[in-house]
């Protein structure tokens, strides 16, 4: 197809949206209004009011609107989720000399690790503290502290880290478990330190959570079950907006 409207009207039942964030709202709305289920690469929109409107539209039509939060489906992160009695969580993302306006950086990149934090926490977040460091309107660093009744979670992102790396660490009375770049797990406890990885033939899409998420979306269309509930997706977008508002953006 050379015309997007012709494509939308061709009888498709679902669509994967991978366009610039600025175009998300109009493209998603057009698809939903035609009765087409949508999988969208994060974010749904960088405008929280638009996120709510699109979620309400999807729900009113009984359609899936699935945000592409692949970390929830990465096997190693699912193992972190299963750890009982978590009391301290550290999530950090580093990038090499990345230059992005603050709002774009928070919604396009921080959103993923913010969502991972909310996914890994087992209770309602009671308080949020945050700090954004920027220069000339571009993000330098950001840190966020989330508190639940029984756990503290620290989330940070550094655009001048000197290395591209993502680390998630869970601490509990049983030990410390750390996952680097979604694939390499280190467990430290009273018995020592243990390394866990994937086999040589394990596919990258599965290791990073994309394969199970996409399968969940396709199966969810038939079952009417969203692998990423719209309530949880909205909560993650709301966290980003709160951070921006609290820091004057």
Which ranges hold each PLM region?
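Short, Asp-centered acidic motifs that coordinate Mg2+ and/or phosphate
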Residues: 13-14, 88, 152
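Beta-loop-alpha module in the N-terminal Rossmann-like domain of NAD(P)-dependent dehydrogenases
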Residues: 1-39, 43-55
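C-terminal helix-rich "cap/oligomerization" subdomain common to oxidoreductases
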Residues: 14-19, 63, 216-249
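Mid-domain beta-loop-alpha active-site segment that forms a flexible
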Residues: 68-75, 96-125, 213, 233
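A contiguous active-site-proximal alpha/beta segment in oxidoreductase catalytic domains
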Residues: 22, 45-100
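A short glycine-threonine-serine/GTX helix/turn-capping micro-motif
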Residues: 101-107, 200-208
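Contiguous beta-strand/loop segments that form the cofactor/metal-binding neighborhood of enzyme cores
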Residues: 111-184, 211-224
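Hydrophobic residues in well-ordered beta-strands that form the structural core
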Residues: 40, 65-67, 179
